[in-house]
Design a protein with these regions (language model features):
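Membrane-interface extramembranous regions
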Residues: 1-133
Length: 133
């Protein structure tokens, strides 16, 4: 568990699971895909669909972190790319009826930040040294 990929995957994964569970517990009942959700910590907005997405992504990161370093790096990069796409989509969805995950600017910042860390870890850390002859 002492490799950066495994540690970062576990920490971010557990954080996403906690956020997802809190979103489900504090859901206002506005609707699963409602464009307006409940505020979490006074800043993060989201609905039950975003809560479940965070739980699934977080669980995948945590399970990969408990596996091998190579698998953790691959999953970190893949989920980092998904979070980057979610952040980019969120830029266009905020304030529209198409915002089925009820993301706001703070959610987008969270997704971009997690994506940057996961992509950097998954693509740049824990790589084997090149063979020398």
């Amino acid at each position: 568990m002492r490799t950066p990929n495994r540690l970062l995957g576990l920490v971010i994964g557990l954080g996403l699971v906690v956020l997802g569970v809190l979103r489900l517990l504090l859901d206002s009942g506005a609707g699963f895909f409602a464009p307006r959700g409940t505020l979490l910590f006074g800043a993060l907005e989201g609905n039950a669909a975003l809560g479940i997405l965070h739980i699934l992504l977080g669980a995948a990161l945590a399970m990969a972190a408990l596996s091998s370093v190579r698998y953790a790096a691959t999953v970190n990069a893949a989920i980092g790319a998904l979070l980057l796409l979610l952040g980019l989509a969120g830029l266009f969805l905020v304030g529209t009826d198409a915002n089925v995950l009820a993301v706001n600017v703070a959610d987008n910042a969270l997704h971009f930040g997690a994506a940057a860390v996961l992509l950097a870890a998954g693509l740049g850390l824990d790589r084997p040294e090149p063979a020398t002859s």
